[in-house]
């Protein structure tokens, strides 16, 4: 009997536990001078959902607003699509490198039916929004080829010598993935322009490659060159 009740409870809990919204991209590039960027949000569920959109600053003063989504709040019927436009309202951003932000699309699930014993989860879809100055518009393709291996004390480090943000998911030496600590993994996922991430005290005498995602979310392997 208890097992049967547990299965029923799990089914009730799971009815709204899966993400309802899907986005048309895993990252959005806002080129300087662009009028807006469109975010297509699709409700994959069988229920009407509310939605809320906002943008968080990653490496800037949290009180300064650079982008405004429209609409910020909306309702979305089952299997329907909502287009949200992101507009740059403050161009006081660096012109010699990219700036990065988090774009948040929060699901607002319908109220559970019944006696209040069931739960619904409000899932937040968070993806990168990258502001690219006009001077950098044409140099992004294959920019990961400019990642260098440098020595910093006893550590070996990867250096991003470019003005672009990289999203690195894996680092390999002679075809074998190395075990990075959580701090290094996080920094690799948002590899800032003109910065370095140290790999620790590892043997880097062999062939070093990184797997990185480009503007379209496609993973590609790149060979890391040693700094001369």
Curated annotation (Swiss-Prot):
Residues 1-19 form the signal peptide. One of its GO terms (biological process) is cell wall organization. The gene is fanE. Keywords: Chaperone, Disulfide bond, Fimbrium biogenesis, Immunoglobulin domain, Periplasm, Plasmid, Signal. One of its GO terms (cellular component) is outer membrane-bounded periplasmic space. InterPro entries: Ig-like_fold, PapD-like_sf, Periplasmic_pilus_chap, Pili_assmbl_chap_C_dom_sf, Pili_assmbl_chaperone_bac, Pili_assmbl_chaperone_C, Pili_assmbl_chaperone_CS, Pili_assmbl_chaperone_N. It is found in: Periplasm. It comes from Escherichia coli. The lineage of its organism: Bacteria, Pseudomonadati, Pseudomonadota, Gammaproteobacteria, Enterobacterales. Mediates assembly of pili by forming soluble multimeric complexes with pili subunits as an intermediate step in the assembly process. This protein is involved in K99 pili assembly. Belongs to the periplasmic pilus chaperone family. It holds the Pfam family PapD_N. This is Chaperone protein FanE. Disulfide bonds join 157-198.
């Amino acid at each position: 009997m208890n097992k049967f009740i547990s299965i029923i409870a799990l089914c009730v809990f799971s009815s709204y536990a899966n993400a309802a919204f899907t986005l048309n991209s895993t990252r959005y590039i806002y080129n300087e001078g662009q009028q807006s960027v469109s975010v297509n949000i699709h409700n994959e569920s069988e229920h009407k959902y509310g939605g809320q959109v906002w943008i968080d600053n990653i490496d800037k003063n949290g009180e300064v607003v650079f982008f405004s989504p429209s609409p910020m709040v909306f309702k979305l019927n089952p299997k329907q699509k909502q287009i949200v436009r992101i507009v740059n309202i403050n161009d006081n951003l660096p012109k010699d490198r990219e700036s990065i932000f988090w774009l948040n699309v929060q699901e607002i699930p319908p109220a559970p039916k019944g006696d209040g014993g069931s739960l619904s989860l409000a899932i937040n879809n968070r993806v990168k929004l990258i502001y690219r100055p006009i001077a950098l518009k044409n140099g992004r393709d294959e920019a990961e080829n400019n990642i260098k291996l440098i020595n910093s004390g006893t550590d070996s480090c990867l250096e991003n010598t470019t003005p672009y943000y990289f999203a690195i998911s894996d680092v390999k030496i002679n075809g074998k993935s190395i075990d990075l600590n959580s701090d290094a993994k996080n920094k690799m996922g948002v590899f800032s322009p003109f910065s370095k991430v140290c790999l620790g005290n590892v043997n880097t005498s062999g062939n070093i490659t990184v797997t990185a995602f480009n503007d379209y979310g496609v993973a590609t392997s790149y060979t890391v060159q040693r700094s001369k």
